[in-house]
């Protein structure tokens, strides 16, 4: 009986450590990568269905223009909701991954280890993304605001709290769930690729490199590169679904993920679903590395291993 109680206590501690470590790791990473996230958001929205003009000629041009006209503060637009989004999503995603993986019986060098990690990553990612989606919606709208400041029908927000308040007033609570399913699908795909690739790559790397920061970085670089290609079409659709609504002159133009992808490809060509790809990679690569490295270190810290 006492053994079972101790096991339950240890499992609860592992979940708590995983959640707290994931949240703190994502906040640290977000502070560094938010400017490139803002650039990615604007690149994905410009030229939308040929209804808006093209402002930026790539990642570097966007970064320079935003810094020149809006300064450092402009590059960190949406940072507060980004913190809440990442802490919620990554805390749940990283905190529950080991729990789900263990429940599925995923163990290195055993049958179906990769597939079980894939399922665990997708499930953990979808749950985390759905929980953090309202914060992501507010973040996207705040990051895009200065692109549409001359649009008389666009409603800007003075703060994250004001954004939530205005969205609820104009669109109802349902407005905060806009794009939630697409966000869950996007992150399920990304998490499945990232976490399963990271785990498998880490096990391979450990055959040649001692367990430590270099092993984490190499594993994270591989996971970050692969996940960008798989996620970008979902990411473009999610950004556009978040931004549409009663707060801009375009109004309701998409019914969901597939409708958004179809209309985007039809009006802008197939390459449009890869808008912001390099910004996405430049953000996701370092963000993946920083998040997973911080995650490993925080887990060791809270477990008393450091």
Swiss-Prot record:
Residues 1-15, 104-117, 196-211, 296-306 are mitochondrial intermembrane. Keywords: Membrane, Mitochondrion, Mitochondrion inner membrane, Repeat, Transmembrane, Transmembrane helix, Transport. Its main location: mitochondrion. GO terms for cellular component: mitochondrial inner membrane; mitochondrion. It is found in: Mitochondrion inner membrane. Solcar repeats lie at residues 13-103, 112-204, 211-301. It is a multi-pass membrane protein. Residues 37-83, 139-174, 233-276 are mitochondrial matrix. This is Mitochondrial substrate carrier family protein ucpA. The gene is ucpA.
